Amino acid sequence: MITLIVGTNRPGSNTRKVAAQLEEIYAGLKVPLQVLDLAKLPQEIFSPTSYAEKPKSFLPFADAILKSDGLHVVTPEYNGSVPGVLKYFIDMLKFPESFEQKPVCFTGLAAGIWGALRPVEQLQAIFGYRNAHLFPVRVFMPQINNLLDASGKIKDAELLARLKSQVEGFAKFVEKIKA
């Protein structure tokens, strides 16, 4: 099963809207998927004592990562970087087993012209350090507000085709690594 990580905890985020479209693509391809939305992280995880002892309410999130065959991270760009909650989530996971030899795919979006290039590259460095297998096909969505319609759906057919191609390729990548 692939885990789709919604890389922000911002309510009503464009990241969540894009993740919903990726869910539809995975479902259409009949690829088993679970969604891990960082907006649903338990509040007690943000206590300084959580580094030493993880709250029991965090275990389902940590277990989802450990049991996943691959991770598809959807990240926005906040201040030229990865959202703090996404980095914190990564830091809270078990080391090294959470990402060791795990396939990881990245989709980035931003209001600006670079489409989250910086945070995706930062995440590639982090996951590479953690010995993950980085899927080389990344999709960047610059000026995201121009790419979504009033209902939050991606209105650009070429972009949807790129996302579908990314998902198809990543699903094959995960299967090859599992084999």
Predicted segments — roles?
Residues 49, 85-88, 112-117, 130-133, ...:
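Short amphipathic alpha-helical patches
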Residues 2, 7, 79, 103, ...:
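Short, flexible coil/turn micro-motifs enriched in small/turn-prone residues
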Residues 34-45, 95-97, 130-150:
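Mobile beta-alpha loop/short-helix "lid" or hinge segments that flank ligand
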Residues 1-95, 153-179:
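N-terminal beta1-alpha1-beta2 submodule of the flavodoxin-like/Rossmannoid cofactor-binding fold
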Residues 99-101, 150-155:
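Glycine-rich NAD(P)-binding loop of Rossmann-like domains
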Residues 103-143, 158:
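Short, glycine-/small-residue-rich phosphate/pyrophosphate-handling segment
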Residues 29-31, 100-102, 137:
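A generic structural signal for short beta-strands and their flanking turns/coil linkers
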